[in-house]
A protein has these predicted regions:
Chain A
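Short helix-to-coil "ATP-lid" hinge immediately C-terminal to the conserved N-box Asn in the Bergerat
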Residues: 68
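N-terminal pre-ligand scaffold of iron-sulfur
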Residues: 1-57, 71, 75, 84-103
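Short cysteine clusters
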Residues: 43, 62-65
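Short Gly/Pro-enriched turn/cap motifs at secondary-structure boundaries
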Residues: 79-81
Length: 103, 412
């Protein structure tokens, strides 16, 4: 595991997401209700970037077919998704945001 | 609620039937579930059949909702290649083509729809296709060879997705549509024109406003003749001129049907303990405040889930804004709401359009704009008035428009 800084994260507003690639891994960084969340950025149903989706009620909704994942756990919350997406720890220090990714 | 001896019979093992069975177990229904389907395949979704399967990216089997073993695990009895011929409402039973009588506690009809034949199209001409099923898709995919000439009859979503897949595989494509615009039933003409530009830019020829006169061929298709006398040489023809809901089974049993099987917002037909969901229904939508018949993935899935929950004893109305997507030529097109000829069209940038009636958002159409379409759905659901100028201003977040309107609405 290792922490990676996310440049530009502070520009995110509430219930907004950005997509990035860290260590060749697509990651969606989300700011919601004062908390940060990081999820694998690809929907488990069909290829789509979750960071282009809609955030509401603690969930992120896929832009392609409106499947929903819980931000905190990655758990599937609405069909057609049935498989969870991986989530990664996030920390905010001195105005900078870091994501912890498996090696 | 339900006792373990209860038995739900589902007729139709498509997307709706499969999702309903799944949702019944999800709602804790402990009794028997029997799922009858005419096809040999376990329930599958159709969207891929006109897209990734035709592109050769994946086999039609990728469209299955669940592997066959899943149904056994869930205690759902799959009765494939089994046609239900009749419903006997008084004895609460269905009769199969084999003459078997199966009793039900509650019956759910997910009989879907079938392709509308093109009148006058010759039977048995090689190279003429319709696209509805797993096998239709595999057959058509096998014929999409670079350099061949494809004529698509019908400029609706199926026709355009076939045209898209064929162009990407290097065929010469002509789309013929009798109406003056593509997607005539689904989109306002001004927005549909954007879709026409997309196809033209990718090299498809469009013939709008002219009906097909006849299809020529001798054993195999040779050409499509249009009403204006033009003759389009063709190696392949795909006909996509709509679908017809499969209402006959229920009608014969006495259920009321009017452009689809009539159900209320709890998915109940006019027959006692007989429910219906998916393409086959004509249902009351409380948000739109009118009846609709929908031919969509969303409706097949979510109305089926709603029906299952009501059957399992919940009382929950099915109320969603209609939403639909189509993937064409690398562009994801999504629409939410329903069109109306009287709509004012407002563009928000180049890729998102709204349809307004009396300053209320009733329709949104986006090109690679999934997240914004979702926000637009909220605006439609809220049934609030939004000034067109604010809507067109990309500096204003759609979410904020919703909050503003909600706040001003609650101010005395």
């Amino acid at each position: 595991m290792s922490w990676h800084e996310v440049p530009g994260a502070e520009a995110l507003g509430d219930d907004e997401a950005m997509g990035l690639v860290l260590k060749e891994r697509p990651v969606a960084l989300v700011r919601s209700g004062g908390a940060w969340h990081a999820l694998h950025n690809v929907c488990t149903h069909q290829f789509a970037l979750l960071s282009e989706g809609y955030i509401e009620d603690g969930c992120i909704e896929c832009p392609l077919h409106q499947g929903r994942f819980e931000l905190a756990t990655g758990a599937p919350k609405a069909p057609p998704v049935t498989e969870p997406v991986p989530v990664y720890p996030v920390k905010s220090e001195n105005g900078k945001v870091y994501v912890d990714l498996p090696d | 609620m339900t006792s373990p001896t209860e038995r739900i019979v589902i007729v139709g093992a498509g997307q709706a039937g499969g999702r309903a069975a799944e949702a019944l177990r999800g709602a804790g229904f402990p009794g028997e579930i029997l799922l009858f389907g005419e096809e040999r395949h376990e329930p599958y979704e159709r969207p891929r059949l006109s897209k990734s399967v035709l592109l050769g990216e994946e086999p039609a089997s990728a469209a299955a909702l669940h592997p066959r073993a899943w149904y056994a695990d869930k205690g759902i009895a799959l009765r494939m290649r089994s046609r239900v011929e009749a419903i006997a409402p008084k004895s609460r039973s269905v009769i199969t083509a084999d003459g078997e009588r199966v009793e039900y506690s509650k019956l759910l009809l997910c009989t879907g729809s079938r392709v509308r034949p093109l009148s006058g199209a010759p039977e048995g001409l090689a190279g003429v296709h319709y696209l509805r099923t797993f096998e239709d898709s595999e057959r058509l995919a096998a014929g999409l060879e670079p350099g061949r000439r494809l004529v698509v009859i019908g400029g609706g979503f199926i026709g355009l997705e076939v045209a898209s897949s064929a162009r990407r595989r290097g065929l010469a494509v002509t789309v013929v549509e009798r109406q003056g615009a593509l997607l005539d039933r689904a989109l306002p003409a001004e927005i549909a024109a954007r879709v026409a530009s997309l196809h033209a830019a990718h090299g498809a020829a469009l013939r709008l406003g002219v009906p097909v006169a006849r299809i020529h061929g001798n054993g195999a298709v040779k050409a499509v003749e249009l009403a204006d006398g033009a003759e389009l040489p063709a190696d392949l023809v795909v006909i996509g001129v709509g679908i017809i809901p499969n209402t006959e089974l229920a009608e014969t049993a006495g259920a009321v049907s009017a452009d689809g099987l009539v159900v209320d917002e709890y998915c109940r037909t006019t027959l006692e303990d007989v429910y219906a969901a998916g393409d086959v229904t004509n249902h009351y939508n409380p948000i739109l405040e009118r009846r609709v018949r929908l031919e969509s993935w969303q409706n097949a899935q979510n109305q089926a889930i709603a029906a299952a929950r009501n059957i399992a004893g919940e009382r929950r109305a099915y109320a969603e804004v209609p939403w639909f997507w189509s993937d064409q030529l690398g562009t994801n097109i999504q629409m939410v709401g329903v069109p109306d000829p009287a709509m004012q069209i407002v563009w928000r940038g180049e890729r998102l359009a709204f349809g307004l009636l009396q300053d209320r958002v009733r329709l949104a159409v986006g090109f690679d704009m999934g997240g914004e379409i979702r926000a637009a759905r909220r605006l439609i659901e809220a049934r609030i008035t939004v000034p067109a100028k604010r809507l067109a201003d990309t500096a204003v977040r759609l979410k904020d428009l919703l909050t503003e309107a909600t706040c001003s609405a609650s101010t005395p």
